[in-house]
Curated annotation (Swiss-Prot):
Key assembly factor specifically required for the stability of axonemal dynein heavy chains in cytoplasm. PROSITE patterns: WD_REPEATS_2, WD_REPEATS_REGION. WD repeats lie at residues 63-105, 115-154, 162-205, 207-249, 257-297, 319-357. One of its GO terms (biological process) is axonemal dynein complex assembly. PANTHER family: MRNA EXPORT FACTOR AND BUB3. Keywords: Apoptosis, Cytoplasm, Repeat, WD repeat. It is found in: Dynein axonemal particle. This is Dynein axonemal assembly factor 10. GO terms for cellular component: dynein axonemal particle; RPAP3/R2TP/prefoldin-like complex. Component of the PAQosome complex which is responsible for the biogenesis of several protein complexes and which consists of R2TP complex members RUVBL1, RUVBL2, RPAP3 and PIH1D1, URI complex members PFDN2, PFDN6, PDRG1, UXT and URI1 as well as ASDURF, POLR2E and DNAAF10/WDR92. Interacts with PIH1D1; the interaction associates DNAAF10 with the R2TP complex. Interacts with several dynein axonemal assembly factors. The lineage of its organism: Eukaryota, Metazoa, Chordata, Craniata, Vertebrata. The keyword Chaperone does not apply. Pfam families: WD40.
């Protein structure tokens, strides 16, 4: 692919903020996004921005008692577009951003900080009930139904006597009908665990030897296809989730990408073979996954096992000197994304030529 044909990653707008920003998410069906974080005085903040004539307009600033670590619209209806957040106090809140004084849902979900959150069943993505999953430093992963107060519908915690590991990332997947749904969780010691929510069992686990920073299925609402896991030592792994071997599990390909921690992975909503990873030194890498000619083969005992594909780097660019801790593609406009970094900046990026790859 010549330089002229390659996608370009362009910083469209950048804005300095007066707080540490941990997460950023597009508001579905709009030119707006939210940023979440904490002020130096120790309180939490949610800001709503809108893109107007090539600039960012602050529409609303909401201050809360506890610093806000993560957020998702994934369990909200397209009509309401409520934001679910996890904070440093272990609280799960759901906010109506039009009237944010009091949360529409509130539960003390965890004993310690909620590091990570994901949603499914809202926004027309995924069959079945709307659900939120949270992962915490307290070692537990909990699934919540916003229509049901107080208690989680599922609680994945270490058995008694087991060490509690810090859960850094969670992701929903396999939500292709009313019954099926999985949660994948990644931990600070390199463990990846796949929980089947239909029969409440641990379906698969592996260890990638370094802390798991980010997990994402290429699509939440299809039969599991691919899972990307990023880690501390600059590596990421792509698992082919179509074929599970009874002892070897899922086939995977590993790529050494950034020179430092790979903080995030996000698949392009309009093409599941393309994904962006963000690095600890402010870099963004755009990748394409290529399937092998055959996705499965039989082993010596006649059992089906998966065959991993390959990844190719389409483009990379450095936009900051600090880790890019959050990234979100616009679900509506191909190639538009928002990212935030620890230099207290939020950036709107445009990735070109994605329709021709």
């Amino acid at each position: 692919m010549s330089t002229f044909e390659k996608p370009q990653i362009i910083v469209h707008i950048q804005k300095g903020l007066n707080y540490t920003v941990f997460d950023s998410k597009w508001v579905p069906c709009s030119a707006k996004f939210v940023t979440m974080g904490n002020f130096a005085r120790g309180t939490g903040v949610i800001q709503v921005y809108e893109i107007q004539r090539g600039d960012l307009k602050l529409l609303r600033e909401i201050e809360k008692a506890k610093p806000i670590k993560c957020g998702t619209f994934g369990a909200a209806s397209l009509q309401q577009r409520f934001l679910a957040t996890g904070d440093f106090g272990g609280n799960l809140h759901i906010w109506n951003l039009e009237a944010p004084e009091m949360p529409v849902y509130s539960v003390k979900g965890h004993k310690e900080i909620i590091n990570t959150i994901d949603g499914v069943g809202g926004l027309g993505i995924g069959e079945g009930a709307p659900e939120i999953v949270t992962g915490s430093r307290d070692g537990t992963v909990k699934v919540w139904d916003p229509r049901q107060k107080e208690d989680p519908v599922a609680n994945m915690e270490p058995a008694q006597g087991e060490n509690k590991r810090d859960c850094w990332t969670v992701a929903f997947g396999n939500a292709y009908n009313q019954e099926e749904r999985v949660v994948c969780a990644g931990y600070d010691n390199g463990d990846i665990k796949l929980f089947d929510l239909r029969n409440m069992s641990l379906r698969w686990e592996t260890n990638i030897k370094n802390g798991v920073c980010s997990l994402e299925f290429d699509r939440k609402d299809i039969s599991m296809n691919k899972l990307v896991a990023t880690s501390l030592e600059g590596k990421f792994h792509v698992f082919d989730m179509r074929t599970q071997h009874p002892t070897k599990g899922f086939a995977s390909v590993t790529e050494k990408a950034h020179k430092s921690t790979v903080w995030q992975v996000r698949h392009l909503p309009q093409n599941r073979e393309i994904f962006l990873t963000t690095g600890g030194a402010g870099s963004l890498h755009l990748w394409k996954y290529e399937y092998p000619t055959q996705r499965s083969k039989k082993d010596s005992e006649g059992l089906e096992m998966g065959v991993a594909g390959s990844v190719s780097l389409l483009q990379n660019v450095t936009v900051s000197t600090q880790p890019i801790s959050s990234l979100d593609w616009s679900p509506d406009k191909r190639g538009l994304c928002v990212c935030s970094s620890f230099d207290q900046m939020v950036r709107v990026l445009i990735v070109t030529k994605l329709q021709t790859i």
